[in-house]
Amino acid sequence: MKLQLGLLSTALLFASCATKSTAEQDIVSENFEFSASQLKHAFTEIDSARAHLTEKQIANNVFAPRNIEPDGSLRLVASRDWCSGFFPGELWYMYEYTGDDFWKEKAIEFTAPVEREKTNGGTHDMGFKVYCSFGNGYRLTGDSTYRDIMLESASTLITRYKDKVGCIRSWDHNKDKWQCPVIIDNMMNLELLFWAAKESGDSIYRDIAVNHALTTIKNHFRDDYSSYHVVDYDTITGDVLHKHTHQGYSHESAWSRGQAWGLYGYTMCYRETGREEFLDQAKHIVGYIFNSPTLPEDLVPYWDYNAPNIPDEPRDVSAAAVTACALYELSMYDKENATLHKDRADRILESLTKNYRASLNNDRGFLLLHSVGSGNSNSEVDVPIIYADYYFLEALLKKAKLEKEGTALL
């Protein structure tokens, strides 16, 4: 009798584990099934929007979806826009998950227009544009043409490095306001440089990326490990002139997507260098995010952790998606808290799936609703934005790979 009960208990345990594993995997497969239908709808929406482009817009290479405008229309942007690489990146992720050449051909089509950015020395967003598009394409196809474009892009990006400052300059605009602005977002563009160092054998790319990351640790973070958005430097002395926000609530507030950029960036920097200060920084940022008294129970933050009218403030789904991506990878390195990091990432994906997803064959083909571009300037507030979708698919891929292969690296 005892043996029978033991066998029954063991069977129930295995059944429970199998059910949980299947349920966890289902969130990935179901979301990719949804995304396949939704992105096919997006192609129709894009074609419709393209039909209304002016000759000037066509000449300026307007092609990629970015967000839904206040009037409900689909906004398409040119390759020079910092968001131009996310939609082709989504298509590469669809190809990676499905293996269907339909997505590969579409990814190739939407990646091609970004090539002209490889010589654009006026942008720091080369990683967002080129690594998300050509980077994923090269990883999945091995196309040597893509490799050459990426190396040229990396060479262009490092022309913005200011040796006296120890950082890559971010924006060129508002020169009456800033001398050498560096934004926390720029941590995300370092991955292209680490890749270029390995691919070319030239250490200059890695050295610049490491210097930028170290300088950012020194000057961007407060004592509680929340991050400023913009740090402005004197180009002659390298001294800090100002610490500001541009997209957050105030200069001393914690803009939620900025915290996510930092977390993702330092997790990636640890992967590429093995330097403990980068892992420590990522862990500190996690501590700030998840100890914030304003973080909602569903782990989808308000657009700024210090926004004045919480809980009556918009959420930023994009910040949650980026955070989930970082947590899956961080769980590989921070062994002591691995389960906690993964559980939090899983909870974020569950929240996004249940409560923030777009309606099928609606919402101009976007996957997620309720992101905020810049609450400070009332721009792209509580709307679908393309980078939320990109990092949502990335997080799903990382979850699937982590559970199947024990690694979140794509």
Placement of each model-derived feature along the sequence:
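Short, linear, compositionally biased motifs with a strong N-terminal bias
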Residues: 10-12
